Amino acid sequence: MGVSPERLAEALRAALRENEKFRKRQQKLSEPVAVVGMSCRFPGGVGSPEQLWDFLVQGRDAVSGPPADRCWDPAALPVSGGGFLHDAAEFDPAFFGMSEAEALASDPQQRLLLELSWEGFEHAGINPESLRGSRTGVYAGVIFHDYAYRLPEPPEDVPGYRYFGSAGSVAVGRLA
């Protein structure tokens, strides 16, 4: 007892209708993504996408000695070089509405996220101020939360900021 050709044809038509419904539903859920602006910081003094391209084309090496402005003794390190962001401490806290004390207690990852997000919008020709109050999502991944533990004992006006400044969960809030 087989299936009649008519029933098979109707089952195939029903499956095609379901596939079409699914395709339309998926199409509504999928929005195109366009990268319209970029920014970056890499070891070797790379501070923009254009500089990164030049760096790669020239085949340069980003390995250098450790920066002296970090919370470590370069002579005591077990390595003589690495890929370091030498300008990580350069930050304009007033531009981002932060006090000097808050900036000092903030993980460099948070400061870089603020700077690079702003630069990415500028690179795209978008005024970051125009996004205030808009339906814009902020997503960021932050790893290695060891900055607070590496800080020497902070000045008296910094402790209140120390924990928020080193929490990865606060990074997107600063940006938003």
Tell me what each language-model feature is.
Residues 4, 8-14, 18-21, 25:
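Heptad-repeat coiled-coil/leucine-zipper oligomerization helices
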Residues 25-176:
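Cys-dependent condensing catalytic cores that perform Claisen condensation/acyl-transfer
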